[in-house]
């Protein structure tokens, strides 16, 4: 079975689940990961990094470790994933922007980290009237916490949500914990990834699956307005991810 046939088969199964009932997607092994416009264009299609004075990039912590993390978008097959090396003391505020850039999101919507009943988001995004505390939920300012405050051991997992309308959910896995050499710079590094990020505001999981099916087959879903398919233009390619260009772009975030 070719890659395209595999992709289409997974889309068909996903659509059946949406129509006949939701079934959780199976866990993805890390073995699956190793297959290898704005006017101011850059590989991720993004904007400049917010001024670092808006939040601390790194927090004061002792014994800073080298974390390898893998972020994957939930509910989409084939998996859209990125792998990064980050210092364990990276602030959640800075990490949130790093993850949006690495995935390919344009930072046009709210985002948050979740671990259990603890939610972490930028202070500028917190509005008690819009997001009141619900039964046991504890809200934190992401500027005040670093990654090692919520992940410490290999295998730890945290959720990362983006765009509460389209409702994108990501899983962050702590793949490894290592030590820095004395002369090794402690910085953010993109080291792997595969498949393109969905377009902003395309309608969440269902919308993106519908776009992909049209891209591969030319078939339109019943009841979907013609204008919806304008997302699928000559630049749309679900399998596109320029790893080397993105590595260079992400390295610029360390400046």
Task: Name these PLM-found stretches.
Residues 1-255:
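Short linear regulatory motifs enriched in tryptophan with gly/pro/ser
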